[in-house]
Amino acid sequence: MRKLALSLFVAGCLFSGLSLHATIFGKIQGIVHDPQHRPIAGAAVKLEAITSSWSQTTQTDDNGEFLFTSVPVGDYKITVTQPKFDTTEQTVTVASNSSPILHFQLAIASVNQTTIVVSQADVANVDSVTPTTLVNRADIAQTPGADRTNSLAMITDYVPAAYVTHDMLHMRGGHQVDWLIDGVPVPNTNIASNLGPVIDPKDIDYLEIQRGSYDADYGDRTYGIFNIVPRSGFERDNQAELVTSFGNWYQTNDQLNFGGHTQRFAYYASLNANRSNYGLQAPIGQVVHDAENGYGGFASFTFNPDPKNQLRLVASLRQDFYQIPIDPDPNSAGNQIFPSFGLRDSEREPDGYVTFSWIHTFNPNLILTVSPFYHYNKASYEASPNDVPVITDVQQTANY
């Protein structure tokens, strides 16, 4: 009897927490009616992602209502068709845990059939009080410098009160933030010890930034939450892309990526490399001993066995290297406080993570998400044996 009671208690705890998890999914619901506001049953409703080939279809019920569950964060177009009525379209933006409600009024078809396109204005997510900013792949590509591997312009250029100082991203005055991939956390408790990027911006499809008033299940990093929807391959048809650049300070940010999809399966993978002679923020106007470089790989796989199940796998492995900038003038005011002119130190940061998600839809109001993950992180501060004064090495390794 005690074992049964304990089992029921554990099961209750598990199921009570189903709704308390970070996610990248929302749902879209709506109603279709004629000019007299009578519901139209059996109308075909198609949901299409604007930035990829991902789509779902359904039909309205006897009440003229339709529902799409487990819709990833992003921008979508909904098309409603029914014989004897004009085709109608609307666009909508889905945020995590949101549930926008759409209304379609179908006009009686004329002899020359037309398509009515309704452009929906951007509105606040009424399902949440959390201030949210959504940045998509096109925004990153069109923002100067935002697609560089070490750049945070995709955040600082779009999010109020976001800025970078002493090489750390700050939001609302603090740098304790959380990163999530597909709604799965990539934890790192070594606050301010890591400088390398969590993901190359070129691998991002959508980035949802939350900056306060979020649910407790997101953790205790109270200054900001960055929820990444990586590129899936639904935007590709077995195609590859090579991105190269070259700029000041012998800077280059290069990537080779490829992806493709079928009706139920999509894949995306990339390799990237970057370097620059201007890495970290220098203590003075002169840039000395400040090179950086990095390389890595990223992969994303999505499989939909049936309409009620989805499997998502994301993996990343990269290494970054930074020289620690110095002030070369031994007589400067800064060197009188702490002499750095004799230092030749560096920071090396290997990092890798794997996240897996199984999303099962029981009904429109109950979705189960199982998301195991593993994250390896290391920050190695490496001092030169010729340092003056002597600096010790610091090795910090974490497994999550």
Residue positions per predicted region:
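Transmembrane beta-barrel wall of Gram-negative outer-membrane proteins
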Residues: 246-275, 285-322, 346-367
